[in-house]
Amino acid sequence: MSMHTLLQYKWEMMTPEFIVLGTALILSLMDLFMPDDKDRRPLAWIAFVGVAIALIATIGLIPAKAVSILNDTFRLDAFGKAFKLLLLAGGALSLLLAFDYRPKEGLKDRGEFYYLLLCALLGAMIMASSGDLITLFVGLELLSISSYILAGIRKTSMQANESAMKYVINGGISTAITLFGMSYIFGLTGTTNIKEIALEVQKLTDSGYQYILAIAFLMMLVGLSFKISSVPFHMWTPDVYQGAPTPVTAFLSVVSKTAGFVIVLRLFITIFTQAPAQGKDPSSLLFSMQDYIAFLAGATMIIGNTIALKQRSMKRLFAYSSIAHAGYILVGFAAMSWVMIDSIWFYLLAYLFMNLGAFAILQRISDEADSDDLSHFAGLYQRNPLLAVAMGIFLLSLAGIPGTAGFIGKLNIFLGALMTEPGHYVLAAVMIATTVVSYVYYFGIFVQIFFRPADETTSLRMPIGLAMVVVLCALGTLLFGVVPGLAYHFLE
């Protein structure tokens, strides 16, 4: 490729990625030359500013027409821009959590934490704009490898080391399975470009090729199910969430999960809605596999909510809650239509606000008590009424109570499931039943906060970083719960 050709590309379309990459490089150099005894936490503010600028740059690119560069390996379209906004917002809020993370084994001398988190965020952004299997895989690995290191960054913690090891093993297996499925697609079509694959799979009318394509679909679904924590590939989630630092847990629960659904939607809708399925009506491979996806969604909702009932560790409880929410989103994928993409995006937006806000409060309480046990939430209303009300808002939204963004997200997916075909009525019923089950553990926390006496009588103050996260997330949860049209209008 000549220099003239390189200069002709519209590199300004990659401005957000360049900003995140440049910020990561600056932080790595600053960390290298800072004295060893210097507190590294102020680097979080530099990282936050970089991500905020990248977010503004992404908003500035919204009016731009869809364009692809680098031989269609990088594509900036409406899909990519919409999900990049979620990824950047989640990354920025996670960095604010990191600034005020103060356990005994904290991030005070871990400067690598901040640029590793930016590298993970960059990988997720590349996945959102990937137009080629190779680009997509590079982004996936950048996100995955950075996340493995972040999960075990507390090197002296045995729990963190154990969780990181489980994450590496499970993540490596899932990556191998995903790559194996991609290799089948490449073997059948002779190309790694996603658009070209979508055209080539339409020509696979031979039954033998269609069976191989179905195997590729299932292998990629299995591999990516690890990333989104769906049953039965969810086993790593509770241990990693509990062992990782709270900012990392929050990042994995929002940014990594969103990136997982980005790759699922980008690949499966583009490729497998065009692929024929032998002896099936309709003749799309994706639609012929909806029953399997629906089964995964139902099992994920049931198991996630059921096991969460017995948890005392708040991190493990939110881990199983995260699994259950993956099931709710999978309902939208099982009942797939073009309308459901908007519903999935809105659900991930709502989940970003309510989950990160809850993790900010959890971090403050667990840092003070040196434990994430549910009992430490007792009497929070007496110690900090505003913080208790904010946590109540997040819990109500996670439970799907009207007036919150979580309710709108669940309602849209529920109605979408009812509108597709009668077979999804069962899935919608499971969604309602498991949502009711979730009330038990969400309102169990609610009872601790408002109706149990506090062990500590001192006022609980919030550092500036955590306070910013709580305020922004509470406002977002209420605003999009009352006026959801703002988000949908912006998306359009």
From Swiss-Prot:
One GO molecular-function entry: NADH:ubiquinone reductase (non-electrogenic) activity
Function: NDH-1 shuttles electrons from NADH, via FMN and iron-sulfur (Fe-S) centers, to quinones in the respiratory chain. The immediate electron acceptor for the enzyme in this species is believed to be a menaquinone. Couples the redox reaction to proton translocation (for every two electrons transferred, four hydrogen ions are translocated across the cytoplasmic membrane), and thus conserves the redox energy in a proton gradient.
Subunit structure: NDH-1 is composed of 14 different subunits. Subunits NuoA, H, J, K, L, M, N constitute the membrane sector of the complex.
Annotated catalysed reactions: a quinone + NADH + 5 H(+)(in) = a quinol + NAD(+) + 4 H(+)(out)
Mode of membrane association: Multi-pass membrane protein
A Pfam short name: Proton_antipo_M
Key words, A-Z: Cell membrane, Membrane, NAD, Quinone, Translocase, Transmembrane, Transmembrane helix, Transport
Known EC number: 7.1.1.-
Spans through the membrane: 13-33, 42-62, 79-99, 111-131, 133-153, 168-188, 211-231, 251-271, 284-304, 318-340, 344-366, 388-408, 426-446, 463-483
Protein name according to UniProt: NADH-quinone oxidoreductase subunit N
Organism annotation: Geobacillus sp. (strain WCH70)
Similarity-based family: Belongs to the complex I subunit 2 family.
Enzyme class: translocase
Gene Ontology terms: biological process: ATP synthesis coupled electron transport
GO cellular component labels: plasma membrane
UniProt cross-references to InterPro entries, sorted A to Z: NADH-Q_OxRdtase_suN/2, ND/Mrp_TM
Localization, UniProt: Cell membrane
